A protein has these predicted regions:
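Cell wall/extracellular polymer interaction/catalysis modules
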Residues: 26-198, 207-234
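Bacterial N-terminal signal peptides
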Residues: 10-18
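Bacterial N-terminal signal peptides that target proteins for export
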Residues: 1-11
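Intrinsically disordered, low-complexity regions
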Residues: 1, 14, 33-36
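Sec-dependent signal peptide cleavage junction
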Residues: 20-26
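Short cysteine clusters
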Residues: 201
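A conserved hydrophobic position in a structured secondary element of the catalytic/binding core
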Residues: 204
Length: 234
């Protein structure tokens, strides 16, 4: 575990030193890289979050916006973390981040609404994200424990327990049918303490997550794969 942490932090340091992934170019008119504009998802939306895996648990993450003239602009870049076991999620608990193009279908957090264009839920002590695979227990959905007092808490996430990670969150609509066992609680969220990986989520620094929350729109697509498979380069 110690060796994995050291390797992960080393990879993150390298990403931070790279010109394309170091300082976020928030608010500046920086053209999006050609490989981003060539992604199939770019033809389906006017806003993208791109997660390009670099190494097993680190990623180059960027946000892009198409203007009224059809020109793509890169509005945010940052290094970040993906699942402890890398990419290619297939089941609950495999510690992998999903591969593909997905929408964000829910915005929430421990902090108050930062002005998100998606409906935002400020969570309290009653809120869990269900990992309960039994019928009727709202697998892979936000639930109020008062309505589901028999929820399997051990396999669900009590949102407020993740004080740093879940200040701001966007749910990645990976398991669209809420199929039990396929995977749950796959979010884009803030960095947590110490660990250079996630359980399958996408993690970025808190200030970058706040930027995403303030700029994301309902039609945004998040594209996740290795940087190589995306045709990208740093």
């Amino acid at each position: 575990m110690k060796r994995m942490r050291t390797l992960g932090l080393a990879a993150l340091t390298v990403l931070m030193l790279l010109p394309a992934a170091g300082e976020a170019r928030q608010g500046k008119e920086t053209p999006s890289p050609e490989w981003v504009t060539a992604l199939p998802a770019a033809a389906k939306t006017e806003q993208l979050v791109v997660v390009g895996g670099v190494g097993q648990t680190t990623a180059w993450i960027s946000m892009h916006q198409k203007d009224k003239n059809g020109t793509w602009h890169q509005i945010m870049t940052t290094p970040g973390f993906i699942g402890k076991a890398g990419l290619g999620k297939t089941k609950e608990g495999d510690a992998k981040s999903p591969v593909g193009a997905f929408r964000f279908n829910k915005a929430f957090g421990i902090a108050g609404d930062p002005g998100c264009a998606l409906p935002y839920t400020k969570v309290d002590n009653n809120i869990y994200w269900s990992g309960d695979q039994r019928p009727g227990m709202q697998y892979d959905r936000m639930v109020d424990i008062r309505k589901y007092p028999d929820l399997d808490k051990e396999n669900s996430e009590h949102i407020v327990d993740y004080k740093e990670h879940y200040q701001y969150c966007l749910n990645i609509n990976y398991n669209t049918l809420h199929t039990p066992g396929l995977g749950s609680a796959l979010f884009m969220h803030c960095f947590g303490p110490n660990k250079p990986f996630t359980g399958g989520c996408i993690a970025v620094p808190k200030d970058k997550m706040l930027f995403v929350m303030k700029h994301v729109n309902p039609e945004c697509l998040i594209v996740i794969d290795s940087l190589e498979n995306l045709g990208g380069k740093l």
